[in-house]
C-alpha cells in the first residue's frame, strides 16, 4: 500500500472512531479560540499621538473584534485572550503615565486597566516592561494577577520574581466539559543587552527553554490538559544575539506545546506565512516541530486568532487541529467602553503634547535622514555631545516621517522625533574600535529597522557600499587628520547601544569581561531627567530658537553596485 493510501486509511479510521465515540456519548468535541496581541506599546485607542490623527491601532479595536467573537460563541466554543508583552512604552500616553505617577493609583495604568476590561487571561512581560524599574512595573500591574515572567528570577530566592507568576492554569468549559489550559509566559533573556541594570536590580533573566520545560512538567502534574506558551521573543535572527530570540529553540525542545505565541520582532506570523530560520530552514504554515506559531505585529494593528479543534475521548482531551491567522483591525471601530475608560488620560496626554518648548527658524526634515546627513540627526548628535562632553556622538534616525516644522516646536513633534526612553552614555574608544563601530553601522545602511543604523557626528567619513563588509569605511578623519588605531576618543551613545543593542559593543570588542571606560552616565547624573528625549527638550528650551544646520560630515557612495 502506498504512503498516501496509508495516511488516507488512518485518517478515515480516526474519523470513524471519533464519530462512533460521539454517538455513544463517550466523546466531546469543540473549539478553543485563543486571541493574542503583542508589542501593543501603549496603543489603547485608535490614535497616533505623533501625527495627531486617527489610526488603525490599539486595544479598543482589538476589544471590538473580541466582543464580536464572543457574540458568536456556542456551547461548543471557548475563548482565551493572551498578550505577549511590551506594554508600558511606545506612545506619549505611556510617557505621560511615567512622568506623572502621582496622578494615578496602583493598578490604574490605562493599558492594564484595558486588559482587565477586555478580559485578558494572561499577560507576559516584554523587555520594555523593565524600562522604568521593578517598582513601576508592580504599580502599573497591581490589579492584574496574571502577569507572567517565568524566567524573571529573584536573585535572593532563585525563584520566579514575586512581581510576576511563572504560569496560570485556567479551567474553561466546552459543551459543559472542563478543559484545563496551562499558560506559561517568558521574556527574552537578552534584556541586559538593552536595559540599564538599575531598572532590573534584584532580578536576572535566564534562558527560556529549561524554564518552559519545567513549567510544562509542573502544569501536567497540576492536571493541565493542554499547554500554551507566550514568549516575548521572536524567531531567531542572524543579526541579533542568539539569546534574544528563541522561538525555534523553544518549539524544538517543547513539542508538548499546543500553541506558541511570540513577539518582540514586530512581525506577523500565521498559517499563511512560512517561517525561515537563520540556518535557512523553512517551516511551512508556521509550524515548528508540530508546534503552531503566531505573532500579531505591533501597536494592536493585528490580533492573532488561533483556533484549536479538540475532542475528548475516555476522559482525555486531544488537539486535533490548529489554525492560526492574524486579523487586521483596519476599519474596525473602537470599543466605546475602552475609549471612555482611557479618555481622561488621553485628554491629559494631548494637552501635555501641545506644550511649546521653543521655535525653529527653518524646517528639520526627517525624510531620508537614515540615508544621508541631515539637520535632524545632527541636532540629536550635537545635543548628545554637549551633554556628555564627548568628542563624538552616534545616533540613529528613529522616525523618518517626523519633521520639526518652521515655527513653534511642540512636545508632540519631539516625542515623534525621539520615540524611545533611552538614556545617554559616554565611553572611551580607540581609533581601531571607532572604525569597527562604523563598519558595523555600514552593515545596516539601507536596511530595516532604521534604529539599527547609527550616524556619527564629530568625525568625517565615507561609506563605500560597493566594497565587501568590513572594508566599507574608506575615509575616517578627526579634525582633518586620518584616524589611527591607537588614537583615543570619547563617544556618546544611548543606553540601548551601550548595553549591547544591535551589536555595536560586541563589534568593538566590549563585553562583560572587557567593559568600556564610562565617562558619562545620564542615569547617575540626572535620573529620569536623563532620558535623551528630555535632554532634547531641555536643550531647545534653553536655546529658545534652533536653526537647521547640516555639516555634511559623511556620505555614502557605491550604492548602485552594493554587495
Where do the language-model regions lie?
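Binuclear metal-dependent hydrolase catalytic cores centered on His/Asp/Glu-rich metal-binding motifs
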Residues: 47, 56, 161-163, 167, ...
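Short acidic, glycine-rich surface-loop motifs adjacent to enzyme active sites
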Residues: 36-45, 79-90, 181-193, 213-238
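Core catalytic region of metal-dependent phosphoesterases/phosphodiesterases
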Residues: 67-157, 253
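Solvent-exposed loop/turn segments at secondary-structure junctions
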Residues: 40-44, 87-90, 128-132, 153-156, ...
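Conserved beta-sheet core of the metallophosphoesterase superfamily
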Residues: 83, 122, 139-149, 242-305
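Gram-negative bacterial Sec-dependent N-terminal signal peptides
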Residues: 1-28
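Catalytic centers of hydrolytic enzymes
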Residues: 30-33, 37, 42-71, 112, ...
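Loop/turn elements at helix/coil->beta-strand transitions in domains of secreted/extracellular proteins
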Residues: 30-33, 74-80, 118-121, 143-147, ...
Amino acid at each position: 500500500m502506498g504512503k498516501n493510501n496509508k495516511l488516507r486509511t488512518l485518517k478515515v479510521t480516526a474519523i470513524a472512531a471519533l464519530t462512533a465515540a460521539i454517538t455513544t456519548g463517550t466523546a466531546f468535541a469543540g473549539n478553543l479560540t485563543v486571541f493574542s496581541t503583542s508589542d501593543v506599546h501603549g496603543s489603547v485607542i485608535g490614535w497616533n499621538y505623533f501625527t495627531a490623527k486617527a489610526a488603525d491601532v490599539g486595544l479598543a479595536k482589538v476589544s471590538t473584534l473580541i466582543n464580536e467573537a464572543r457574540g458568536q460563541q456556542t456551547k461548543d466554543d471557548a475563548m482565551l485572550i493572551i498578550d505577549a508583552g511590551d506594554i508600558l512604552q511606545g506612545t506619549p500616553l505611556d510617557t505621560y503615565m511615567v512622568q506623572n505617577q502621582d496622578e494615578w493609583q496602583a493598578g490604574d495604568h490605562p493599558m492594564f486597566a484595558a486588559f482587565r476590561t477586555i478580559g485578558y487571561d494572561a499577560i507576559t512581560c516584554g523587555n520594555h516592561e523593565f524600562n522604568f524599574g521593578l517598582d513601576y512595573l508592580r504599580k502599573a500591574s497591581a490589579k492584574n494577577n496574571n502577569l507572567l515572567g517565568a524566567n524573571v528570577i529573584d536573585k535572593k530566592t532563585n525563584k520566579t520574581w514575586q512581581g510576576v507568576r511563572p504560569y496560570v492554569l485556567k479551567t474553561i468549559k466546552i459543551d459543559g466539559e472542563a478543559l484545563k489550559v496551562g499558560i506559561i509566559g517568558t521574556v527574552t533573556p537578552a534584556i541586559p543587552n538593552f536595559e540599564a541594570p538599575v531598572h532590573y536590580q534584584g532580578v536576572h533573566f535566564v534562558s527560556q527553554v529549561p524554564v518552559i520545560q519545567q513549567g510544562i512538567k509542573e502544569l501536567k502534574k497540576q492536571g493541565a490538559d493542554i499547554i500554551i506558551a507566550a514568549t516575548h521573543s521572536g524567531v531567531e535572527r542572524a543579526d541579533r544575539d542568539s539569546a534574544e530570540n528563541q522561538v525555534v529553540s523553544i518549539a524544538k525542545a517543547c513539542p508538548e506545546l499546543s500553541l506558541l505565541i511570540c513577539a518582540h520582532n514586530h512581525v506577523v506570523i500565521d498559517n499563511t506565512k512560512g517561517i525561515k530560520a537563520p540556518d535557512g530552514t523553512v517551516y511551512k504554515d508556521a509550524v515548528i516541530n508540530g508546534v503552531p506559531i503566531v505573532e500579531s505585529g505591533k501597536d494592536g494593528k493585528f490580533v492573532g486568532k488561533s483556533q484549536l479543534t479538540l475532542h475528548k475521548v475516555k476522559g482525555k482531551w486531544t488537539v486535533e487541529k490548529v489554525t492560526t491567522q492574524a486579523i487586521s483591525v483596519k476599519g474596525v471601530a473602537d470599543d466605546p467602553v475602552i475609549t471612555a475608560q482611557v479618555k481622561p488620560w488621553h485628554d491629559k496626554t494631548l494637552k501635555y503634547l501641545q506644550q511649546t518648548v521653543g521655535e525653529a527658524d527653518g524646517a528639520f526634515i526627517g525624510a531620508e535622514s537614515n540615508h544621508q546627513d541631515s539637520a535632524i540627526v545632527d541636532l540629536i548628535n550635537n545635543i548628545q555631545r554637549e551633554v556628555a562632553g564627548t568628542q563624538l556622538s552616534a545616533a540613529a534616525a528613529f522616525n523618518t516621517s517626523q519633521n520639526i516644522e518652521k515655527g513653534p516646536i511642540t512636545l508632540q513633534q519631539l516625542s515623534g522625533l525621539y520615540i524611545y526612553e533611552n538614556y545617554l552614555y559616554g565611553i572611551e574608544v580607540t581609533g581601531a574600535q571607532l572604525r569597527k563601530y562604523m563598519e558595523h553601522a555600514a552593515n545596516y545602511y539601507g536596511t530595516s529597522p532604521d534604529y539599527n543604523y547609527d550616524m556619527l557626528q564629530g568625525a568625517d567619513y565615507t561609506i563605500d557600499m560597493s566594497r565587501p563588509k568590513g572594508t566599507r569605511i574608506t575615509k575616517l578623519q578627526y579634525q582633518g587628520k586620518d584616524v589611527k588605531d591607537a588614537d583615543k576618543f570619547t563617544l556618546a551613545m544611548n543606553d540601548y547601544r551601550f548595553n549591547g543593542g544591535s551589536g555595536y559593543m560586541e563589534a568593538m570588542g566590549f563585553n562583560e569581561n572587557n567593559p568600556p571606560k564610562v565617562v558619562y552616565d545620564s542615569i547617575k547624573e540626572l535620573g529620569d531627567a536623563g532620558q535623551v528625549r528630555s535632554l532634547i527638550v531641555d536643550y531647545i528650551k534653553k536655546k529658545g530658537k534652533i536653526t537647521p544646520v547640516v555639516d555634511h560630515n559623511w556620505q555614502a557612495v557605491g550604492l548602485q553596485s552594493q554587495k
